Design a protein with these regions (language model features):
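Conserved catalytic region of serine esterases and O-acyltransferases that act on ester linkages
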Residues: 79-188
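Generic alpha-helix detector with strongest preference for long hydrophobic helices that associate
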Residues: 28, 32, 39, 75-82, ...
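Generic hydrophobic/packing signal
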Residues: 9-12, 56, 86, 91
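Generic detector of short, locally flexible boundary/turn motifs and exposed helical patches
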Residues: 23-26, 61-62, 80, 162-165
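Extracellular serine-dependent O-acyl
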Residues: 13-20, 37-79, 95-109
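Active-site segments of SGNH/GDSL-like serine hydrolases
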Residues: 2-40
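Short, solvent-exposed polar/charged micro-motifs at secondary-structure junctions
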Residues: 25-26, 68-72, 124-128
């Protein structure tokens, strides 16, 4: 039904998303319902099939998040990217989902900015996705004005709602900083 509505707007890019997982393997409490995520995967697979048939985009949050959970649970059986209800993502889980979504859109490897300065030659040799001006080089100082065309994502280190993890904790399980948040400066 909803597919027919979507088809009325061919100029709009459609992306279907497979749900985050129900974490039935973490041991942070005793309220796991084995088999629940298997049922969720049936819905994920249905959405993936619909996306393929209609030539729409698809992002699977479930399988990559399950893989991360299981990898981390090998060392810490209480680890989870999900909250206390085992289905809704925790703060670090949300960053993992954002990373997976952005990566699926082809944004991995896009620079925030990259600057290279030749100090001896007193010149900017690279300024990707930014503008560098007013370069001044002396024997003990180098200054310049930097105008970014984009900004890095500010990783949150705060705890919310008594969660065990922060958004920053996700950086240990996904290469977000390298793939999505690189802002480089090199002086030679």
């Amino acid at each position: 039904l909803i597919e027919e509505v979507y088809k009325k707007y061919p100029e709009v890019r459609k992306i279907l998303i497979g749900s985050s997982p129900y974490d039935e393997t973490s041991r942070f409490n005793k309220v796991a319902f084995p088999g629940k995520n298997t049922q969720i995967l049936k819905i994920v697979d249905f959405l993936n099939a619909r996306a393929r048939e209609n030539q729409w985009g698809f992002v699977d949050f479930n399988r990559p998040m399950v893989a991360i959970n299981q990898w981390e649970q090998a060392a810490d059986s209480m680890y989870t990217l999900c909250g206390k209800d085992r289905i809704h993502p925790s703060t670090d889980g949300h960053l993992v989902m954002a990373y997976l979504f952005l990566k699926a859109q082809g944004l991995a490897g896009k620079l925030v900015a990259d600057i290279r300065i030749d100090g001896a030659g007193k010149k900017v040799t690279r300024s990707d996705n930014c503008r560098v001006s007013d370069l001044s080089v002396s024997s003990d100082n180098l200054t310049f004005t930097y105008e970014a065309k984009s900004l890095p994502y500010p990783i949150d280190t705060s705890y919310y709602d008594n969660e065990k993890h922060t958004q920053a904790d996700a950086l240990s399980v996904i290469p977000f900083m390298d793939e999505m948040n690189y802002e480089g400066l090199s002086v030679s």
